[in-house]
UniProtKB/Swiss-Prot annotation:
Subunit (UniProt): Monomer. Component of a complex that contains two dimers of PRK, two tetramers of GAPDH and CP12. CP12 associates with GAPDH, causing its conformation to change. This GAPDH/CP12 complex binds PRK to form a half-complex (one unit). This unit probably dimerizes due partially to interactions between the enzymes of each unit.
Gene that produces this protein: CP12-2
Location(s) in or outside the cell: Plastid, Chloroplast
A Gene Ontology molecular function term of the record: protein-containing complex binding
Organism, as annotated: Arabidopsis thaliana (Mouse-ear cress)
Disulfide-linked positions: C75-C84, C117-C126
GO biological process: cellular response to anoxia; cellular response to cold; cellular response to heat; negative regulation of reductive pentose-phosphate cycle; peptide cross-linking via L-cystine; protein-containing complex assembly; reductive pentose-phosphate cycle; response to light stimulus
Summary of the function given for this chain in its UniProt record: Acts as a linker essential in the assembly of a core complex of PRK/GAPDH. Coordinates the reversible inactivation of chloroplast enzymes GAPDH and PRK during darkness in photosynthetic tissues.
SMART domains: CP12
Compositional bias annotation for Basic and acidic residues: 105-131
Pfam families tied to this protein: CP12 (PF02672)
Region (Disordered): 97-131
Keyword presence, Chloroplast: yes
PTM description: Contains two disulfide bonds; only the oxidized protein, with two disulfide bonds, is active in complex formation. The C-terminal disulfide is involved in the interaction with GAPDH and the N-terminal disulfide mediates the binding of PRK with this binary complex.
Protein name: Calvin cycle protein CP12-2, chloroplastic
Length: 131
C-alpha cells in the first residue's frame, strides 16, 4: 500500500522473503504515521482534514462530510486495517468528484459574453462573420 500525500508513510511488511526463500522478521514494530487519526491528539505540523464547504448543488459536500465521519469511525479501532484504507480511498474519490464538479461549474459559466450571446444572438456584439 503506497500513498502519495503529505504526512503519510509507505507501509511495509513485517516479514519478507530473502533470496534463500526463508522468512526474516524485522526487528521491532513498524510504526505508521497515522495522519487520519487527528482527533485523538494535538498536532502542530500535521495537516488537518476539513470538510469541503464550497461545492456545487447536488449535495456532494454533504456526501463527502458523511464519508469523512464514517472513515474516522472506521479507523478509530484499527487505523491500519484494510477497511480503514478503503474508507479513506472513498473519501479521496468523493473529494476529487466534488473538485471536478466545481471546476466544471466554473468552466460552464465563466464568460459573461458567451452567456449574453446565448440569449441575444442577433446583437452586434454576438455576430460572427465568415470571409
Amino acid at each position: 500500500m503506497a500513498t502519495i500525500a503529505t504526512g503519510l508513510n509507505i507501509a511495509t511488511q513485517r516479514v519478507f522473503v530473502t533470496s534463500e526463500n526463508r522468512p526474516v522478521c524485522l526487528a521491532g514494530p513498524v510504526h505508521l504515521n497515522n495522519s487520519w487519526n487527528l482527533g485523538s491528539r494535538t498536532t502542530n505540523r500535521m495537516m488537518k482534514l476539513q470538510p469541503i464547504k464550497a461545492a456545487p448543488e447536488g449535495g456532494i459536500s454533504d456526501v463527502v462530510e458523511k464519508s469523512i465521519k464514517e472513515a474516522q469511525e472506521t479507523c478509530a479501532g484499527d487505523p491500519v486495517s484494510g477497511e480503514c484504507v478503503a474508507a479513506w480511498d472513498e473519501v479521496e474519490e468523493l473529494s476529487a468528484a466534488a473538485s471536478h464538479a466545481r471546476d466544471k461549474k466554473k468552466a460552464d459559466g465563466s464568460d459573461p459574453l458567451e452567456e449574453y450571446c446565448k440569449d441575444n444572438p442577433e446583437t452586434n456584439e454576438c455576430r460572427t462573420y465568415d470571409n
